[in-house]
């Protein structure tokens, strides 16, 4: 069943603590925060470490402080399978030790650690989702990314939903 009145999409700079707390105070009875805010380009993260650390890690820290202040008890965090890096044993499962090999992955792992600290202290309940991209982007069924085009499955899905492109091809 559709409940558009039960959800609020809020776009703001998580490092702006005053605005963040103001928004959370305005939306009473928040059951759960879905935290998808992050920069996510691996190549760019190597060139702009401070930008990625401040946005992804410091932003998450600000959000955690704000949800504690505002009494929100649940968070679902959009992490990344990139935190696993290169593993000797395949397939990778969630018990694999993280071995981040990019600054982007490092920021996701640090954010997970910060969230876990809050959860272990009893402040929040938390789930971190470590996404893999299981969908081939090439018609020969190869897991391949063409970096000259959007490589974000969600952005393509949204383009289809907004009728900006006709079809989503999954191979």
Regions of interest found by a model, annotated:
Residues 6-8, 126, 168:
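Short, conserved active-site loop motifs that form the nucleotide-linked donor/cofactor pocket
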Residues 8-32:
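Conserved Rossmann-fold cofactor-binding substructure of NAD(P)-dependent oxidoreductases
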Residues 9, 52-53, 67:
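A hydrophobic alpha-helix adjacent to the NAD(P)-binding/active-site core of NAD(P)-dependent oxidoreductases
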Residues 18, 57-65, 113:
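Conserved active-site region of classical short-chain dehydrogenase/reductase
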Residues 35, 61-103, 117-127:
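Conserved Rossmann-fold NAD(P)-dependent oxidoreductase catalytic core, especially the SDR/UDP-sugar
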Residues 38, 48, 53-60, 76-79, ...:
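Short alpha-helix in the Rossmann-fold core of NAD(P)-dependent oxidoreductases
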Residues 42-59, 92-100:
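Short alpha-helical oligomerization interface
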Residues 86, 99-137, 154-165:
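Active-site Tyr-X1-5-Lys
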